[in-house]
Amino acid sequence: MLNSLDLEGRPQDTRVVVAMSGGVDSSVTAALLKSEGYDVVGITLQLYDHGAATHRKGACCAGQDIHDARNVAARLGVPHYVLDYESRFRETVIENFADSYASGETPVPCIECNRQVKFRDLLATARELGAAALATGHYVSSRRLADGSRALLCAADTDRDQSYFLFATTREQLDFLRFPLGDMTKQQTRELARRFGLSVADKHDSQDICFVPTGRYTDIISRLKPNAMVSGDIVDLDGHVIGHHEGIVHFTVGQRRGLGIASGAPLYVLSLDAANRRVVVGPREALKMHRIVLRDVNWIGDGALDRAIGAGLELFVRVRSTRRPQPAWLRVVDGRYEVELVAGEEGVSPGQACVFYDGAEGQSRVLGGGFIARAMAQRANEAAAQSGTLAQSFAAELRG
């Protein structure tokens, strides 16, 4: 018989490691599983030098958070361990974050943390401890498929859904992961925390970039990649210099404020040219992109990716964590994966993720995704038509 975590065996015979960040979500996850009789072990990862961030609201995995996680574990009567992952986190997350910004991208460090640390190293530790599952406080859910594997689903609470940050999870990892909060709202989670008597019931939510103690990510980049702070030109779509900047890391695609340019019409950042240290700006209508080239694609849908795509796979995609999934097509073009956005999207930035879904409503299935390498305004048919016109013109010149 399967227990509440869809595992064989009685709860009291089932060890579950809970990733405890010190926040209300992971604390309630541990409390729920403990109340159901599971053999719960709490693990907190110390991910960075927390001295400057100890008392900053919104920090995660810092000194105060470790203290809170330890207190919750003591309240629940479960063993709790703190593992030092600072070196690993710096190598795989912080340095990649700085590299990405220096190359003109807008990275999502939470995705790398989940992929490189939490769902790889911590999961391996959970297995070594004899656990049957690793549970987290993410607002997503999963369900067993007919073949015994598991599908990743969006949270019931669409305002709290965190599936965007978990697209890189592998099938093997999904089989071992459990997400007890997937059907809850944040309000319900806090109410449970109060019912369990947890001190973190009203604690502030953590922010995305947990390792930036001052809240200014450029401080991290200037220390690790000083060349990224070199000044350069701000140019318009025709390449005319209309201003200057103090480093491309201060900008992201879609940005309007802080350009320092006097203009009759609003200007937006359209792209970042790291090689030439140029920030390209233009009108809002130039922000809309219709095609996206992806890298590092992960597929957790049914079957093999290329077979699923065929001549083209109709699905929904999310290009920013705060946006709703939009209709799109996924294709293989010249050996690379491309997404065509049916209605187009503004502010599509390299370094962000493009996540695949089978629908746009709550608890839709996550099919995978990839990182945005490049975005283009032209639709595929427009590009093909232009290519054909150029070829015809060239042929005519040869005949002439």
From Swiss-Prot:
Disulfide bonds join 113-210. The active site is at 113 (nucleophile), 210 (cysteine persulfide intermediate). The record marks 138, 352 as: Interaction with tRNA. GO terms for cellular component: cytoplasm. It comes from the Bacteria. It is found in: Cytoplasm. It catalyses: S-sulfanyl-L-cysteinyl-[protein] + uridine(34) in tRNA + AH2 + ATP = 2-thiouridine(34) in tRNA + L-cysteinyl-[protein] + A + AMP + diphosphate + H(+). It is an enzyme of class 2 (transferase). Coiled coil: none annotated. Pfam families: tRNA_Me_trans, tRNA_Me_trans_C, tRNA_Me_trans_M. Residues 160-162 are annotated as: Interaction with tRNA. GO terms for molecular function: ATP binding; tRNA binding; tRNA-uridine 2-sulfurtransferase activity. The keyword tRNA-binding applies. GO terms for biological process: tRNA wobble position uridine thiolation. InterPro entries: MnmA-like, MnmA-like_C, MnmA-like_central, MnmA-like_central_sf, Rossmann-like_a/b/a_fold. Its EC number is 2.8.1.13. Keywords: ATP-binding, Cytoplasm, Disulfide bond, Nucleotide-binding, RNA-binding, Transferase, tRNA processing, tRNA-binding. ATP binds at residues 19-26, 45, 137. Belongs to the MnmA/TRMU family. Catalyzes the 2-thiolation of uridine at the wobble position (U34) of tRNA, leading to the formation of s(2)U34. HAMAP family: tRNA_thiouridyl_MnmA. This is tRNA-specific 2-thiouridylase MnmA. It comes from Nitrobacter winogradskyi (strain ATCC 25391 / DSM 10237 / CIP 104748 / NCIMB 11846 / Nb-255). The gene is mnmA.
